[in-house]
Amino acid sequence: GLGLALALPHRRVVVHDGDGSLWMNLGSLATIGLHQPKNLIHICWDNRCYESSGGNPTASATERLDFAGVARAAGIESAWCVLTIDDLVDRMRHALANPGPHFIWASVEPGRTIALSRPYDELENKYHFVRHVEQTEGITILRQPLGHSQERAGH
């Protein structure tokens, strides 16, 4: 999300993150705090477990840890914890109306009500997303690979 926000400063970038993912990369908050992208909204959906890998508890299951406090300490002044839908709506309205970066820590209940069945191919998802950005921004991110004859000629 940060790279996209920095590369496309005229676009609003909203990152949806899970608590497990964020716990494994807390340094991302410090990097966001350092670069201060005005167009970035980072939402952490905290269900207090690694749901995708079996439901083991994350560090936030202790209720002593505060993602919003960590974000503020990392330099993201606009950082909040939301516990209700109304709080989430209010904070999103604020974030959309004001320069960021913004961090929203949303406490949610673990468990899925519907099992999603969809093919998941990380490489295909990457290319699909990049092609969408190329089309909507009118830019080239990925170039076509050079043919063998061009590579040998030093082009």
Language-model region placement:
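SAM-dependent methyltransferases
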Residues: 119-155
